[in-house]
Structure formats: C-alpha cells, structure tokens
Amino acid sequence: MLLNRTDDRTDELALIRTEPISMQWNNELRKTAGLHPNCRLLKELLSLDPYTRTVVYPFLIKGWSSIRIADRFRVSQMTIQTLLEIGREQLKRKLAGFR
C-alpha cells in the first residue's frame, strides 16, 4: 500500500476518494475494460487500490499531467507523484509476467 503515510497524506487521500470524479473515472475504466476484455493494461489498472487507480487512470488514459491531477483533487503534487510511482511499480511488476 502507501509507504510512510502521514496524517496530511491520509487527509489528502480521503479527498481523492470522496471526489465525484473519482467514481466517474472508475466507472469509465470498468466500462472500457469490458469493451476491451483482452487488454491487460486495463485489467491491471482495475486491480490497483482505489487511490492509486484514481490517480493513474487520468495520467495514463486521459493524458493528464501530475500537476493537473493535483489541482483537480486539491492535494499536493507530492501525493500525486507518490501514487503514480506506486502505480508504475505495481503495473510494471504485474505486466512483466505477461510477455
């Protein structure tokens, strides 16, 4: 999960989770994954924890910058960067086994 959570970081994660756009993006991802059942990336995105998935999805699929994501959720860019790094490592590890 997330390393070295501080109270501030935990509060920021709560902001990410409660944003309506978070639910909308998760629904979009599920729908898109259903339309493309053979796409490993979409399946693995769905397997990420909700906080990480909510940050990685707009970064990878929508092409948003980390600054734009941080601004959208009103959290620090460091929180977004941490979640993106966690997501990158998890996806890299999961997708490496499917070569």
Predicted features along the sequence, with ranges:
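Amphipathic alpha-helical segment used for protein-protein interaction
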Residues: S22-T52
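Short amphipathic alpha-helical interface segments enriched in basic and hydrophobic/aromatic residues
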Residues: L2-L3, D7, L42, Y57, ...
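DNA-recognition helix of helix-turn-helix
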Residues: F73-F98
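Charged, low-cysteine interdomain linkers and short loop/connector segments
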Residues: M1-R30
